[in-house]
């Protein structure tokens, strides 16, 4: 007799409280988490920072380190803790490949675990991975803002326009009001 096992793990009730909405943007400190991989994400966060500030928020940009050893990872963790300790809202991206999606979601969940309203940003191609990673940490209800894939390799002016076109949806995904 042959037994066939499902490769899917058993479902566990890990769901944590829902991600809180932002509410009014005016007066909030919105943290935009960048990495060192995607120039297109720098352009997007530049555009979103301008739009957030026009809506009355203050923006703080933090660049995640590239982990090359224990020292960099420890220092990066300390810097991130300081970053999320000084913001009211976290926007973590960009999930655009396997490892960058892992770290963007890791940092989003870290912010959410402190009670911050949080949005993870992934490209459409990496949505499923991002949601799976968040669910593994008990956040199957993480707010995820989807962006088109691919972004990298497009002309700068096109990427900046995409950012502007997606800003209203970012605000809606945050549960924010302008």
PLM regions and their residue ranges:
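Short, acidic/small-residue loops that bind anionic groups at enzyme active sites
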Residues: 104-129, 145
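A charged, well-structured terminal subsegment
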Residues: 145-178
